[in-house]
Amino acid sequence: SSNEVTGNYTTKGIGEVLAAINAGLIADSFGDTPFSQAALPELANGQPQFLTPELDKQEAIYTAIMEYLDAAITDLPKGDKSDEIGEYDFIYKGDGEAWLKLAYGLKARYTMRLLARSSSKDADLQKILEYVDKSYTSIEEQAAFSIYSATNLNPLFDFQWSRDGLAASKSYADKLIERNDPR
């Protein structure tokens, strides 16, 4: 990639951590879902490569998350030749060490997610402890946007916890009842 050529490994690592976070949101929210064939670039004819992407197993998405995080853990300590990312990074202002701690925290999280299917739980529990030791040591280090306040909610939080207006309309419910639809 161009970041590897120019030596902007912190920027690349940040992208890998963000990819892992977003893949985690998808896997945690939907379970089995399109992932490996989803959101791929368009072909020359303007059509997506996969109009009906296949479902990936949630566990496969978690495996991809771990690959993103492993790559980030390799890239982040290498630093950037330019310091351009700092002003564009709303979370850690380009601090590669802070992003590295986040990557290790996420490794702990997703190792725990996979623990139920692990064939070596004791080893994975030990890994979790090692990842936690390399992650945050205080609440001040958490990944948080400083742009949100009581009147400016994080959109994911707002969607998850403020959905009082999302309900079936009376006409829709009446149609379901009329047709003996169990939904």
Labelled PLM ranges:
Residues S1-R183:
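Structured, solvent-exposed acidic/aromatic patches
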